Amino acid sequence: MASDKEYLDFILDQLSDLDDIGYRDMMGEYIIYYRGKIVGGIYDNRMLVKPTSSAVAYMPTADRELPYDGAKEMLLVEDVDNREFLNGLFNAMYDDLPAPKKKK
């Protein structure tokens, strides 16, 4: 099931206090970038983030879910209505995220 553009717009609005938030459409789902690094994505209208050590510490009781069959588990962000929480989560995760891959 593809994610709704309206849900993407809601999440982007929640993250609008952060600099350099971007996204990429990927087969009906959306990859979310923060300052050039992949933080997570929107899958089936669920906000999922990479399970970095800082994300796990920030959301110790978060459920782990698969974004799609065959993928690695990610953390479900349930408190998407809380703008301050989301911004804090992305800032906490940033240093743990791998650098973007160089384009060939």
Segment roles from a protein language model:
Residues M1-K104:
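Charge-dense, helix-prone N-terminal extensions
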